[in-house]
Amino acid sequence: KSGKIEASQANTVADGLLTNLCEKTFSIIREQVKEILTVSDEEIIAAMRLVWERMKIIVEPSCAVPLAALMKNKEKFAGKRIGIILSGGNVDLDKIAMLFNIAGERNKN
C-alpha cells in the first residue's frame, strides 16, 4: 500500500510463500496487479481440508491459498470460470494431521 518494499515478519502455515521481493518484481506487481486478496491460516487449512475431503489429494498450504481466496470471496468470482493448479511436494503428513485437528477443534467452538 505504501508503494515501496517493506520488511515483514510473517508467520504463516503457507511457508512456501515466505519469500522476499526484489525491486524488479515489485515494480511489475505495482504496474500489473490490480488487487491482492489475503487469507488467514484458518482459511488456508479449510481449503486444504476441502481438497482432501473431495479429491483425496493432500496439497501443501501454499498451494491452498488460491482456493482459500476463492472460498472467501465467492461473490467476486460467481459465474466465472476459474482454474487453480494443485501441487504439493512440500508436505509433512504429521504437520497436516495436526493442522486439520487444530482447525477441527476451532470449528467446534
Language-model features: where?
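PLP-dependent amino-acid enzyme catalytic core
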Residues: 1-109
